[in-house]
């Protein structure tokens, strides 16, 4: 690694957490999940795919899908058929604990964060993660200027 690259990496570190960039579908051919390509994952039976997942996700899927998750998968399959016909479909869900499966790749799913629906474009690199990981529920606190009504304690100070 050259010194220029090291400086760029250090600069990224100073910026804090960086939102991952969306990788275009043309570059998906380089993707591998535990040594398997996206095509292999799509053609793989669910039992074999579950064996590739980390323990937490593997245990969750082995116990079976919740009814809400089944409904979401039905919505996704229906949406894929409609999208093949050229229609635009919005998939909204409250299922933040749904594990991203290979059949979801390429879709934009709107995940509820407690206030609004956050659009999440699913790329192959999201496989095995939870939908809720990509729809942040908290907001970074931005404090106002100090003064009257800036804090709860200043409510009791008489205004001049």
From Swiss-Prot:
SUPFAM superfamilies: Ribosomal protein S19. One of its GO terms (molecular function) is structural constituent of ribosome. One of its GO terms (biological process) is ribosomal small subunit assembly. PROSITE patterns: RIBOSOMAL_S19 (PS00323). One of its GO terms (cellular component) is cytosolic small ribosomal subunit. Transmembrane segments: none annotated. Keywords: Ribonucleoprotein, Ribosomal protein, RNA-binding, rRNA-binding. HAMAP family: Ribosomal_uS19 (MF_00531). Belongs to the universal ribosomal protein uS19 family. Protein S19 forms a complex with S13 that binds strongly to the 16S ribosomal RNA. This is Small ribosomal subunit protein uS19. It comes from Pyrobaculum islandicum (strain DSM 4184 / JCM 9189 / GEO3).
């Amino acid at each position: 690694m050259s010194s220029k690259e090291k400086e760029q990496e250090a600069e990224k570190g100073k910026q804090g957490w960086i939102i991952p960039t969306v990788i275009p579908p043309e570059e998906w051919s380089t993707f591998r999940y535990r040594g398997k390509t996206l095509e292999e994952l799509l053609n793989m039976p669910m039992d074999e795919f579950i064996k590739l997942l980390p323990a937490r996700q593997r245990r969750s899927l082995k116990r079976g899908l919740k009814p809400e998750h089944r409904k979401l998968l039905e919505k996704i399959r229906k949406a894929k058929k409609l999208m093949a016909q050229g229609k635009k479909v919005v998939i909204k869900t409250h299922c933040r604990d749904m594990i991203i499966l290979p059949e979801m790749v390429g879709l934009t799913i709107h995940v509820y964060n407690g206030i609004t629906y956050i659009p999440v474009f699913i790329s192959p690199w999201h496989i095995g993660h939870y939908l809720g990981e990509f729809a942040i529920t908290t907001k970074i606190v931005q404090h106002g200027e100090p003064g009257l009504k800036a804090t709860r304690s200043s409510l009791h100070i008489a205004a001049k």
